[in-house]
């Protein structure tokens, strides 16, 4: 018995679009390239009309009774569909969870660096997981870690909102921040406007 191949070497089967001669329905509801209804027409007559106009007969909806076809330039239609799909992929941003790690005994410069990282992640539209790591007996000072995380949330108040308040998880304390959808109006600016 010959050994089984590890993977299928055949090219994937491409699903060809139902255009022109590939349409097998005898009766079709035909729509003109301008959007005008031509009515229910025999398939051969619809193909003749499309050929006279030097356009393609494209099956738009085969679930309708009779199936709906449109006379159009298929190459242009395909290009526009690909362009729309590409734009949709561009606009859909997958939000990721980025992590900022620190110890509760963090120096000022290191803290500022973590704030800068968090701001960069939030501006990119990602959520931020702020983690304070405990080593050994440091876990006894979880109140200091909570204070640090709340200070961080306060410093990032303009760019983010707290999604999950600080809580202990094993030997870490974590807090989740998500990007602020509406800009925060500072209380100081409100006080100046009222005066």
Curated annotation (Swiss-Prot):
Main location: cytoplasm
GO molecular function, one term: ribosome binding
Subcellular location, record wording: Cytoplasm
Region described as Disordered: spans on this chain: 158-195
Function: IF-3 binds to the 30S ribosomal subunit and shifts the equilibrium between 70S ribosomes and their 50S and 30S subunits in favor of the free subunits, thus enhancing the availability of 30S subunits on which protein synthesis initiation begins.
Subunit structure: Monomer.
Protein name stated in the entry: Translation initiation factor IF-3
């Amino acid at each position: 018995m010959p050994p089984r191949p590890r993977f299928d070497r055949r090219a994937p089967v491409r699903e060809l679009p139902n255009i022109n001669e590939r349409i097998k329905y005898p009766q079709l509801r035909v729509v003109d390239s301008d959007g005008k209804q031509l009515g229910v027409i025999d398939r051969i007559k619809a193909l003749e009309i499309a050929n006279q106009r030097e356009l393609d007969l494209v099956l738009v909806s085969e679930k309708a009774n009779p199936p709906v076809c449109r006379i159009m330039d298929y190459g242009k239609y395909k290009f526009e569909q690909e362009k729309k799909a590409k734009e949709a992929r561009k606009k859909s941003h997958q939000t990721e969870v980025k992590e900022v790690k620190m110890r509760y005994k963090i120096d000022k410069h290191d803290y500022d660096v973590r704030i800068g990282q968090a701001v960069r992640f939030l501006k990119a539209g990602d959520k931020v997981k702020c983690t304070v790591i405990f080593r050994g007996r440091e876990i006894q000072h979880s109140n200091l870690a909570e204070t640090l995380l709340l200070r961080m949330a306060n410093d990032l108040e303009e760019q983010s909102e707290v999604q999950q308040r600080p809580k202990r998880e094993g030997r870490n304390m974590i807090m989740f921040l998500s990007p602020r959808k509406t800009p925060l109006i500072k209380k100081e600016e409100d006080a100046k406007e009222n005066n």
